[in-house]
């Protein structure tokens, strides 16, 4: 089963969320992008930054949904909470036709997708039966974020994806390179790459001498494998990666049958 192609997105109801929070610059960029596609745009996003929240759901405390302004709501929860409440609470009278998540400040490549709240928000939309796209703008420190790149290219990428359609159990993960818009080398369909594991744990001590730790966020990328999201983005291309939330490894499933 596939989502039907959409030649003209102007009639779509679009729900936007993210993991950087409702006041993040990236979500404002995504709002502008979405309004080039349709005028029926809604935002339901976390009240505060939820980076690396993954696909977590808040079930041990009540959640508050605060109306920020017309068609903009903040949730004191995770990106997954925000999409779930956006679809089944804020927009329960007329559910969205498309979920857009982002624009994330920084890439979501390789194993990043398992931690990413940006990808998780799109995953929740997919689980709820709605086409969903996660969008991230790659950032290489100390460069400023090139929001102009994603704002220039994203409308065309989204329109092309909608015109084609994709499978109902699939979300689309799009990463934009850390180059100016004019230097983008193209749009490429890619597979998920693999980052080299980074085990950086930084130990510090507070004024009372008690130890605490930070988990290092940096991972080394393997940029050498053609066809991956990592290789494409660091070559200056936009990567478009279809992701499936069915994590079953069917070859090992068959192999393990002989153990029981």
UniProtKB/Swiss-Prot annotation:
It catalyses: a ribonucleoside 5'-phosphate + H2O = a ribonucleoside + phosphate. The keyword Acyltransferase does not apply. One of its GO terms (molecular function) is 5'-nucleotidase activity. The keyword Hydrolase applies. Its EC number is 3.1.3.5. Pfam families: SurE (PF01975). Binds 1 divalent metal cation per subunit. Gene3D superfamilies: Survival protein SurE-like phosphatase/nucleotidase (3.40.1210.10). It is found in: Cytoplasm. InterPro entries: SurE (IPR030048), SurE-like_Pase/nucleotidase (IPR002828), SurE-like_sf (IPR036523). A divalent metal cation binds at residues 19-20, 51, 104. Its cofactor is a divalent metal cation. Keywords: Cytoplasm, Hydrolase, Metal-binding, Nucleotide-binding. One of its GO terms (cellular component) is cytoplasm. Belongs to the SurE nucleotidase family. Nucleotidase that shows phosphatase activity on nucleoside 5'-monophosphates. This is 5'-nucleotidase SurE. It comes from Paramagnetospirillum magneticum (strain ATCC 700264 / AMB-1). The lineage of its organism: Bacteria, Pseudomonadati, Pseudomonadota, Alphaproteobacteria, Rhodospirillales.
């Amino acid at each position: 089963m596939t989502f039907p192609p959409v030649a003209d997105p102007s009639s779509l109801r679009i729900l936007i969320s993210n993991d950087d929070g409702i006041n993040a610059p990236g979500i404002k960029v995504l709002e502008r992008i979405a309004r080039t596609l349709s005028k029926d745009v809604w935002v339901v996003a976390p009240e505060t930054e939820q980076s690396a929240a993954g696909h977590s759901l808040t079930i041990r405390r009540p959640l508050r949904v605060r109306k920020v302004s017309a068609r903009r709501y903040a949730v004191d929860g995770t990106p997954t909470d925000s999409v779930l409440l956006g679809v089944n609470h804020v927009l329960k009278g007329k559910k969205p036709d498309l979920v857009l998540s982002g624009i994330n400040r920084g890439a979501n490549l390789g194993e990043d997708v398992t931690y990413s709240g940006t990808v998780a928000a799109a995953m929740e939309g997919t689980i709820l039966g709605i086409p969903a796209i996660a969008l991230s703008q790659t950032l290489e420190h100390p460069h400023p974020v090139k929001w102009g790149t994603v704002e220039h290219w994203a409308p065309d990428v989204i329109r092309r994806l909608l015109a084609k359609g994709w499978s109902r159990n699939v979300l689309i993960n799009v990463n934009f390179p850390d180059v100016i818009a004019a230097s983008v080398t193209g749009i490429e369909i890619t597979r998920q790459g693999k980052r080299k594991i980074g085990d950086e744990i930084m130990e510090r001590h507070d004024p009372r001498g008690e130890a605490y730790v930070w988990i290092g966020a940096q991972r080394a990328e393997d940029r050498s494998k053609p066809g991956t999201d990592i290789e494409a983005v660091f070559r200056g291309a936009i990567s478009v990666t279809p992701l499936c939330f069915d994590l079953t490894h069917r070859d090992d499933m068959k192999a393990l049958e002989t153990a029981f």
